[in-house]
């Protein structure tokens, strides 16, 4: 996807071999998973040294990288030295309760505590900052190490009190005058007050992580919040629900600006809803949002205060004669992500990953079929509501690969560079490669000067490549790619698995 002429002459990079790195919260055989422990959001920070997860119980858990601290340098620096390159290692840092269950008495509506999204903000003065949201309320958190203060001893030794001249300790006045002056109100012992002993507070070298909520952004969404995204200006962010996108300033919690509103005058005329929204990683005036009809709109906030019109519309024309009852349901986009340079947008609908060039709105430059073999079972998936599952997607920092999840705790990794045939299936377990399949791409067809590629998966209906039946109760919805390395974090129920290549 990136690399220009050099990549074209050297060919696509070789396929990666993925290895297990770590697991947090691993389940034992037969252990029942509590609903509140299921992970619902994952996000790396920009440096890749911190990872945050949110769960359905409203908690945010932070992890920090440890392998770079051992040698005091980044992984890139270590690769240029004689140190053996170790795989990325993270450790538990802290956790805090971000959201609590609430009840909206005006609408008689329960608001669950589940964390929908987490986004990291710019760190400052050694403190970490992040945004977390549930269905209705966004919170801005500051996480900082603070030194623990302890009471060590009293300030004056009792034995020293006898050496203090009595005339100097009576209310700051000479003993004789002070006693006479206050004798009407107070009674002092003869000779004045003995020395006052106060505890001495000493700052120890021990530190404690403290999470403090700095802002609460509430009462701005009538519908469930599905997305939050930081602007590259470091000062603003957007939040999106089914019908609106709002713009916030991080420092102002009681005011937001509605920049996108797709709510019709008559709700009976509603044909699509907003499913995901994301700021451009470089240009703070541009953002994209996806819809339940499978389209992506790129808007420029400089055009007008309310962005009713889009700068570009990305949608794939429907193939003639292919429409069915499920066509519109599976076309709904569940997640979009910009590439690091902002040139491409990756989208995930129920069956496919699609890669879009923002300079070409005629169609995606590549499509990756995630679980095409489930198409004959769409009726079953509709009946058990699995067809409405919202899978996330992610891109590698170099833009050469894309990834997304599937059922049976499987996830797919595809090569995104021109000519690549990489298409791996991995399992969220300690042996990720045991179900791997490598399937060559179909012949690509040209669109103008670009190339559209379609990569297919296993074709056996309702089964995995090794013949096992798909388990629709175990699904890998949430995953994140490290910003600078080939390292993936993914959530399988309450377990966080990490892999590297």
UniProtKB/Swiss-Prot annotation:
GO molecular function, one term: protein phosphatase regulator activity
Biological process terms in GO annotation: protein dephosphorylation
Start and end residues of each stretch annotated as Disordered: 439-466
Regions annotated as coiled coil: none
Tissues in which the protein is found: Expressed ubiquitously.
GO cellular component, one term: protein phosphatase type 2A complex
Matches recorded under Pfam families: WD40 (PF00400)
UniProt keyword Acetylation, yes or no: yes
Biased composition (Polar residues): 439-449
InterPro entries per the UniProt record, alphabetical: PP2A_PR55 (IPR000009), PP2A_PR55_CS (IPR018067), WD40/YVTN_repeat-like_dom_sf (IPR015943), WD40_repeat_dom_sf (IPR036322), WD40_rpt (IPR001680)
Residue numbers carrying N-acetylmethionine: 1
Signal peptide: none
WD repeats: 34-73, 110-151, 220-258, 269-309, 328-366, 471-501
Keywords from the UniProt entry: Acetylation, Repeat, WD repeat
Xref: SMART domains: WD40
SUPFAM superfamilies: WD40 repeat-like
The protein's assembly and partners: PP2A consists of a common heteromeric enzyme, composed of a catalytic subunit (subunits C), a constant regulatory subunit (subunit A), and a variety of regulatory subunits such as subunits B (the R2/B/PR55/B55, R3/B''/PR72/PR130/PR59 and R5/B'/B56 families). Interacts with SIC/RON3.
Family per similarity comment: Belongs to the phosphatase 2A regulatory subunit B family.
Function: The B regulatory subunit may modulate substrate selectivity and catalytic activity, and may also direct the localization of the catalytic enzyme to a particular subcellular compartment.
Name of this chain's protein: Serine/threonine protein phosphatase 2A 55 kDa regulatory subunit B beta isoform
Taxonomic source organism: Arabidopsis thaliana (Mouse-ear cress)
